[in-house]
Amino acid sequence: QALLVEFRPNQYRTRRVINGYAYPFVSNYVLRVTLPYLSGLYIFSYGFTKEGEVVSPALDDQWMINEAYENDTKPVLTLTPFDENGVFSNNLITALVNNEQAIENLIGNLIYLMNEKGFAGLDIDFEYIYKEDRDAFTSFVAECTRRMNEYGIWVSVALAPKTSSDQKGLLYEGKDYGGLGAAANSVLLMTYEWGYTYSSPMAVAPINKVRQVIEYALSQIPEAKIDMGIP
């Protein structure tokens, strides 16, 4: 889980915007005492099939949506490309973003579901995108934003922690900071995940690396669109 600290233009800097991720199995008590401090509740997560059908969480999340509204917090649907084993599937991403009919199906199904359940926003959290799918993914986000905004739904997209445009690696090459910053209403900078189970020993979010990610993001994306992720 992570917190999202949102940057806004100068005139809003006295106003703190704090969002947070939560699973449907979160403790009722923990959620209720946390919601008064949150601007947005990012419910993790919804999946999809290669044909564009939405896959809902195994556990009911309507109670979370209801609790969010009772605390003036916006509920956000987090969309992830998980396979049957619960891990990110880049092949599923490829199948979706290169198929216009699947995209049309998914967006239509999401809009129907989100209006029915009361979601106020969509968070697109796709990771390990093939570099060959970079532009197609950006176009997918742009189309989601265009369609969702017609219904008053805000769209954000999660960005892997890049520090340059030519950064190598499966986690980075499929994400176009500038393109996605223009395509979505806002972006979540994943400034963390530097140190993890299979990496060299280091902090999860070293301050110097966090600073580099933010500085690169600011060179590509308007400040008002940037949300800073904290692990």
Outline where the language-model segments fall.
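Extracellular/periplasmic catalytic domains that process cell-envelope and extracellular macromolecules
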Residues: 11-14, 32-37, 69-71, 115-116, ...
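Glycan-recognition patch characteristic of GH18 chitinases/ENGases
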Residues: 6-109
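Substrate-binding surface in catalytic domains of secreted glycosidases
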Residues: 50-60, 134-231
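Extended, hydrophobic interaction surfaces within ordered domains
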Residues: 1-5
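Hydrophobic faces of well-ordered beta-strands that scaffold small-molecule active sites
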Residues: 18-20, 39-43, 73-79, 122-124, ...
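Pocket-edge positions in alpha/beta enzyme catalytic cores
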Residues: 95-98, 129, 172, 202
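Active-site beta-loop-alpha junctions enriched in small/polar residues
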Residues: 23-25, 46, 80-82, 127-129, ...
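Active-site groove signature of glycoside hydrolases
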Residues: 45, 105-136, 185-200
